[in-house]
Amino acid sequence: MTDMEQSLYRQVLADHDYVVRLRRHFHRHPELAKEEYETQGAIEQELDKLGIAHRRVAETGVYAEIEGTATCEGKPRCIVLRADIDALPIQQENDPEYKSLTPGKMHACGHDGHNAALIGAARILNANRHLFPGKILLTWQPGEEIGYGAQQIIESGAIDEADRSFGVHMASNVRVGSVVLMPGPNNASVDWFRIRVHGLGAHVSTPEEGVDAAYIASQIVVAAQALVTRRTNPVDNLLIGIGTIRAGTTYNVIAQEAEMEGTVRAMTPELRKQAKERLETLAKQTAEMYGGSAEVEWDDFASPLMNDETATAEAQKTALSLFGEERVIRSRRVSFAGDNFAAYILHVPGAYAYVGSGNPDKPDTCVAQHNAHYDIDEDALTVAAALYVCYAVEYLNGEV
């Protein structure tokens, strides 16, 4: 570590209990996407205590700025740091002392940790404005779990002046203390779809007089997998998953209507576009073949998350200096979980780091995200906060 990194890291360590308290507060009081009003208020309260100017963004999000007082040659740089803040509609089944107090809702994806770590980073950065020139933009993004927030923040113009973007995500399948930072594809795109199939009802004993929407839907489900296995290069990363199917009204009536919902996930914009076009064609033509019709509705949750090569190399340099070679992972299997921080990177070159939060000695920290027993090893909060702080300061100083 450099002398500056050592100083900043010591401050992050000293604030560990503060960040843990914040994280546990957010964990006890989870709020779903676009409902994060109390969370927003708690963030604002902490920023007020720190004397950091802020405003609301994307309805339930928070935007803040910290301007450095150091001087530099040339145009000062600007970086945006991001944390997502929404929870999930899951009933928590484990029983930590900070268990969710809201029935049917919990932080099962680490967003409570991201939120707390960014507040902790803001506290350190604000106390060390003399160490950097330029400006740090802080965004607490709502609604990530439903593909909301990122685009709304971008469209507000809040991050237009940024030259770099940086975000983190807890990773239960990475040991606490380690960081994953790799260039290029990290996360798949996420597109939601609903296919409605229209048939013709009739008595089950006279199938020739009806058009069986349930049968058509089942054929679409099976055929959709051939778009992956028979229409896509085996080395390309594509997933088509169907999670719900509903059809018919009773046992002895041919289903007149059927509906299914699912997701398409791809690692490149080209493959994403191709898969969506082919699935829509398949659904409509399959329905027509059996005398029915189909319509497909889409919602874009997230683009493929592609870490910028230069920004990732910069963040890797910071991470290597902070944590050492053995704790920085620069290549691993890509994830089919999406994150609309991808929109930030498309707007402002940036990097997204996975922060290890799993500890085999604490089994709940190793279960998958979106599990009712999910938890994090809170030592990961220090790693996340240190990354936010040190990468931002070093980028603004032109040291990475």
Briefly describe each language-model feature range:
Residues 218-400:
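Metal-dependent amide/peptide-bond hydrolase catalytic core
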Residues 4, 15-18, 22, 35-46, ...:
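General structural feature for long, well-ordered alpha-helical segments within catalytic domains
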Residues 80-82, 91, 193, 352-358:
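Non-cysteine beta-strand/loop elements that form the S-adenosyl-L-methionine
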Residues 88-90, 94-106, 112-113, 119, ...:
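Histidine/acidic-residue-rich, glycine-tolerant segments that coordinate divalent metal ions
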Residues 31, 84-86, 143, 171, ...:
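Active-site beta-loop-alpha junctions enriched in small/polar residues
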Residues 2-107, 112, 116-132:
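Acidic/His- and Gly-rich active-site-bordering loop/insert found
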Residues 26, 64, 81, 111, ...:
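Divalent metal-coordination and catalytic microenvironments
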